[in-house]
Every structure is written in C-alpha cells, then in structure tokens.
Amino acid sequence: KSLSTYTKYRIGCAYVGEFLQTHYHVKDIALKELSLPFITDYETFLRTDKHLKINSAMVFVRNLRAMVFRAIDNEWLVKDPFRRYEYKEEETTREFLSKEEIHLLMETPITRKKMSMVRDLFLFCCFTGLAFIDLYNLKEENIKEFFDEGEWIVIHRQKTGTEANIKLLDYPKQIMEKYRGLCEDGRVFPVPNYQSCMDSLKRLGKKCGITKPLSWHCTSHSKFFYLLNISELSIL
C-alpha cells in the first residue's frame, strides 16, 4: 500500500478507538458485535465530532469495511454488518491552482523552516505533477540526462505502475539542488510524513491568502493546467 493509504488507515484506527471510548465507553468490542447501527453511529461521529465532510467520512467508513471484509475472508466473522449500509457521496469539482496562486506561493515570505520546506516540496510537485508518494520515493537514480542535455525524472508511479518521464524545468531544479545530499538513503528530498505536510500546507495556504484548500491533489491538476498554457509557464 502507498504511504498515504497507510496513513489513512492509522488515522482511521485512531478514530474508531476514540469513537468506542466516547460512545460506548470501552476500548474495544468483539467483531460479532459490529452492526448496522454501529456503522451509522460511526459515520455520525466522523461528521459531527471530527467535523469531516461526507466524502472524507466515507473514506474512513470504507477503510473499516475493508477490515470487516478481511475478517469475513478469514472466517473470523460470519455476517456482513455493511450489507444494508448505504454509502453517501457528493460530487466534487477538482480544484487547480491558477498562475496567480502559484505566484503567491512562490513569493510570499516564509520564515518558518518547516513551512518553507513544505512549500518547496508542494511547488516541486506542481511543476512536475508528482504525487506525494512518488515525491517521497524520488531517488537520485531517477534523475536522468537525456539527448537534449536536460535533466528528466524517470519514475514508475506507485499508484498506477506506469512509467513517467518528466522534464525538469529551472524552478524545480533549483528546489532539488537546495535539498540534495540531505538524505543518506539516496532520496532527493527529506519528506516529512503525509499528515505533517498536510497540516503545514493548510497553514501555508492561509499565510499566502489562498482561499482554495491546498492538497497534493492540486499539484497534478496545476501541472496539466500549465502544460496547456506553456507560454505562461515560461514566464513564471
């Protein structure tokens, strides 16, 4: 599984533990006690106590379902408590960052060291389209020099397994050089854990005056937006 998936499962386990203590006043329950009311109460807990939007809540409900299915496959559980559960989702429009917002990220003075690093990592992904897990796994051996004498990222994307060849523009190369040599395991960047980066990213957005919620999903959309406006990309 990817690092982000692992992180979501860890957070989900913590949510279930908190739900059990606050609503049932126990630390755990037997698998056979899982029921439809338990699941709907857990969904309500996610949406009220944890203030999650419906689609985010469904991520953690589905993670719980995956664990239940594993229990059924291993014959630890006979009945499926999710059998009559109805999933709820809202249609969302994927956000991309505009040229002006990219400029705000690049030019807003940041004095806090960690926030500055997260900004660099985020902008590197904006210019390359790398997902967070691919940024985390990026190694020196993935940086190649091709026939055009330019540097390229050659990497297999973890989510899809497909190879990606990404030309490095000047700005992401500058970011890469800034952190090169800091990792002893051959990775290009000393990437903090996903949740820590997301926390810093939220504060970064507020600091820069960007109203859109920043996430690593924005980076790939921003990259394709700029590829479609290559003349504008050249003047960033």
What do these predicted ranges mean?
Residues 4, 12-22, 48-82, 133:
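N-terminal DNA-binding recognition helix of tyrosine site-specific recombinases/integrases
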Residues 4-7, 20-44, 190, 216:
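A Lys/Arg-rich helix-loop hairpin that forms a DNA/phosphate-binding surface
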Residues 34, 59, 117-118, 191-195, ...:
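Short basic/aromatic active-site micro-motif
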Residues 54, 58-62, 77, 81-132, ...:
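Basic, Lys/Arg- and aromatic-enriched nucleic-acid-binding interface segment
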Residues 69-80, 125-149, 235:
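Short, charged phosphate-coordinating catalytic segments
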Residues 86, 92-95, 101, 137-177:
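Conserved tyrosine-mediated DNA breakage-rejoining catalytic core shared by Y-recombinases
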Residues 123, 127, 133-134, 203, ...:
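C-terminal catalytic core of tyrosine-transesterase DNA break-rejoin enzymes
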Residues 157-177, 182-203, 209, 215:
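C-terminal catalytic core of Y-nucleophile DNA break-rejoin enzymes
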